[in-house]
Every structure is written in structure tokens, then in C-alpha cells.
Amino acid sequence: MSITRLLVLPLAAFAISAAVLTPAQARQQDPAGSQAQRDAMARLAFMDGEWRGTAVINSPEGRTTLTQTERVGTHLGGSIRVVEGRGYAADGATRFNAFAIIGWDERTQAYTFHTYAQGYQGDYPFEATEDGFRWRTPAGPGATIQYVATIKDGRWHEVGHYVREGQPPLPYIEMDLRRVGDSDWPGAGAVSPE
């Protein structure tokens, strides 16, 4: 038997078995995700809705105040939560726009947090707390920005500190938002099959 035939036969058998197994596996998957994912998202339901208030950002260039909005809702049958934040200048121009997806990884038993903002994207540690959440993002060598949010009684208060090893935390951003209503985003408006 030639070496080519020895290599081709197992590869062909693998390809056939993969083609046969894939439709069966696909039928077993729940398009709404798992119950564990939905349960993890339910613990964050306090985030849902439309929010508006202020964001104060401290930078080397000075202090900037924006009108900040957030809209939050679930998708994929409640198995993920999506967040869009926008910061508006006094003239109404969008100065900041971010989008995030919060999920639950059953293998690690931890939340996942993937964000897009200002031309960057990344996966960052995210932890639900009793009355909010916390997360952090790298901010250069030996530094992070650590965010802590408290959401209760219709108020979303989030503070971010720039933390460099061996130095005291510096205030970077503070958001103070009020819940202004419910939102059917992003689930509403799906394209119908006909």
C-alpha cells in the first residue's frame, strides 16, 4: 500500500464522519443557548433598558463632560446581553461610541466580556457583583483601568480608575445615569422569514 493511500483513507473517513455528525449535532443545539447561559444573563437583568446622564472624563488634556447614554438588552433567546454606550458633546455630536457583548462560558463558569470602542476591541475580565459589576482593561505597561459599577433604584453609577503598579489609583471616568425607560433592543426588528 502506498504512503499516499495510507494518508488519504483516514482523512477521507474523517471528512465523511464529520459531514455525517455535523447535522445531527446541529439539530441537538438550542438556538437560544443553554439554560446555564440564560440563568447567568438573568442575574444581570438590572442592566436592561435605556439610561441617560453624564460622563466626566479626566485626561492629560483636561476634564470633559459628555451626555452619556446606554442601552442594554438580551439577544439569542436571553443567552447573551448586549450593551451600547454613546457619549454626546454639548452640540449633540457623538464623541464616544462603544459596544459590548456579555456572555457566560459554561466551561470556565465565568462571564465573558468582548468590547469594541474607539477602533479597539478586546476580551476583558468581567465580574457580576451583588448590585452591579466590575471589569478592567489594560492601559499600557504595568497599568490597567479598573471599572466598578453600582446599579440600583434606577441609577447606574460607574467609576473607572487608572491604576499603575506602585502608584495610587487616579480617577479616569465617572458615569452617573438614570434609567429612562424600557428597551426592546436588540431583539425587536428581526427580519421575518417571509
Predicted regions span which residues?
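N-terminal signal peptide c-region/cleavage motif recognized by signal peptidases
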Residues: 21-23
